[in-house]
Design a protein with these regions (language model features):
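Metal-dependent amide/peptide-bond hydrolase catalytic core
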Residues: 1-175
Length: 175
């Protein structure tokens, strides 16, 4: 930690480094179809101590210090495992370059696998659409991957036909 008067000298600090990384993610990765990433929260300062869940942080600092620690947690969504690995490679490359006086690392925690539309899923979706229209309801089409969430079906979708992501978009914080 150092005094803020020297921030543009040899130590930019952890918050500037996190901002640089996030902006480079945006510049290099935005616009790839089916790929989204979102920094869900940032905690930075003199100290940033997480609880056992890793989602609640107690942060301390002052406005006149160069913050030595920043934690960013986010979400990465993708349409295929290959796309996931390409995005992670770009992210690792960005993180490996540092502003003077800084260091950074990135880790990834897998939760839900990718779930591209499979031929079996397309067949079931076509049947569902046919029934929907026969009952006088609107056509049912596959939604853009960027508008869908993760579903438990993604774990078995490579092995059995299925469809997911047809529910209402909802509202509030999880829409």
């Amino acid at each position: 930690q150092a005094h803020s008067a020297g921030v543009f000298g040899g130590n930019y600090g952890a918050i500037y480094e996190a901002a640089r990384i996030l902006n480079e993610f945006r510049v290099r990765l935005v616009g790839e179809p089916g790929l989204t990433f979102n920094p869900g929260f940032i905690a930075g300062g003199t100290t940033a101590v997480g609880d056992s869940t890793g989602y609640t942080f107690e942060v301390h600092g002052k406005t006149n210090i160069i913050s030595p620690i920043t934690v960013v947690k986010g979400d990465l969504r993708f349409q295929s495992e290959a796309q996931k690995e390409r995005a992670r490679g770009v992210m690792r490359e960005i993180v490996a370059k540092h502003l003077p006086g800084t260091d950074a690392s990135i880790t990834f925690d897998d939760s839900y696998p990718a779930m591209p539309l499979t031929p079996g899923g397309a067949t079931i979706l076509a049947q569902y659409d046919s029934v929907s229209r026969a009952l006088g309801y609107p056509a049912v089409r596959a939604q853009d991957a960027n508008r869908r969430g993760a579903g438990d079906l993604s774990f078995v979708a490579p092995y059995i036909p299925g469809m997911d992501g047809l529910g209402a978009l909802g509202g509030g914080g999880h829409s």
